[in-house]
Amino acid sequence: MFPITIGLNHKTAPVEIREKVSFHPSEINKALMELNELSALNGIVLLSTCNRLEIYAATPEVELGVSVIKKFLARHGKLREEDINQYLYVHTLYDSVRHLFRVVAGLDSMVMGETQILGQVAEAYEKSSQLNLSNKIIHAIFQNALAVGKRVRSETQIDQHPTSVSYTAVELAKQTFGDVQGKSILILGAGEMSALTAKHLVASGADTVLVSNRSMQRAQALAEEFSGRAIPYEELDTALAEADIVISATAAAHFVIKPERMRRVMEQRRQRALLLIDIAVPRDIHPNVGELEGVTLFDIDDLRGVVDSHQKAREEAALQAGRILEEEMGRFVKWHNSLYVVPTIVALQRRGEEVREIMLKSALNKLGPIDEKQEKIIRSMANSIVTHLLHAPIANLKEAANTSQGHLYTEILQNLFDLDGNELSPHAGWSVHHAASHHSNQG
């Protein structure tokens, strides 16, 4: 089985494409089961966040596995394959593992070092496990990846600087108004992103926080947590007329705020300036709303332009994280190679024992009656011949296991001694020629 990753993110696809292929949380289990029905895939994990959509899987045939996932994403997004392919990246074998390590470390995020991604990856893997869709190799890859993410955050300062998307949204509001104190801030949605945004707003000195959500109970719970005020969803227009800043992060599948609605609100406000920050995917606010007089609209892609005052410190932390990542990749490769090398050595030793027994039986039959001492000497000599003959190839294979040519040496040894492939590890075979069998795009 070979690991593969197919996906798109904020670097490869605009929000218009990302929102087409994104999955609502309620859709993920169904999507996982549909993917599981595809015979080319095994051990499937689906990661869907506001900035990325990625499918991790194991497959016996890399080309086929990649192809069926691309077709699946095209169908889900109601796009032609040729239209979506330009936005997709593909990682296979060790590149797939390295990519996941980068993701959990926060090195592949829009805001480098963000803290949310570690939990999002853990949740994605947990959903797969609950549906019994993980296999041994995917389990090992994700367990190692989560350990890498935790190690990076414990040994570097990559998460000690404000680096989440929700924090960046607050920073954008502060840069626009100079300060959020004294401003009326409306948060649409009561999920994790909304809670994080409210946390950063209060930490920045906001004294009026309004929360509106379709579930009044959830809105009240979030508002109470931050001494804010819950607004019934039916009174959203009134809240929009009151607010200075609106940060929208719902899980709606359609636009919550459209131009005609916002036009009425702005008339009530008498065109008083309003800042809208849409950090939802799919977007909550229709892009044409930003064309209205007095309205400034930023969507999640616009957050890239926010100046990060901690850039230098974060870049240094990223260098440290990169070193940790490569160290952990080395350990993973060594572990994975052992899955292939150890069974090969066992199979080689077993082959030696089989040949020894066959030749001993033949020799003893030809010799006729001999005493116990003579038979013991003959058996000892046969054991020594096999042991000495296999010593060098086994020792050299162990030494080569930790090099880039390890799999090549292993395959050569298997072919030379005609070892039974059924005796070898089911995870074996990420060889040099396999690694070259599929192009891996950057993403």
UniProtKB/Swiss-Prot annotation:
GO terms for molecular function: glutamyl-tRNA reductase activity; NADP binding. Disulfide bonds: none annotated. The record marks 99 as: Important for activity. Keywords: NADP, Oxidoreductase, Porphyrin biosynthesis. The keyword Nucleus does not apply. It catalyses: (S)-4-amino-5-oxopentanoate + tRNA(Glu) + NADP(+) = L-glutamyl-tRNA(Glu) + NADPH + H(+). Its EC number is 1.2.1.70. Pfam families: GlutR_dimer, GlutR_N, Shikimate_DH. NADP(+) binds at residues 189-194. It is an enzyme of class 1 (oxidoreductase). Pathway: Porphyrin-containing compound metabolism; protoporphyrin-IX biosynthesis; 5-aminolevulinate from L-glutamyl-tRNA(Glu): step 1/2. GO terms for biological process: protoporphyrinogen IX biosynthetic process from glutamate. During catalysis, the active site Cys acts as a nucleophile attacking the alpha-carbonyl group of tRNA-bound glutamate with the formation of a thioester intermediate between enzyme and glutamate, and the concomitant release of tRNA(Glu). The thioester intermediate is finally reduced by direct hydride transfer from NADPH, to form the product GSA. Belongs to the glutamyl-tRNA reductase family. This is Glutamyl-tRNA reductase. The gene is hemA.
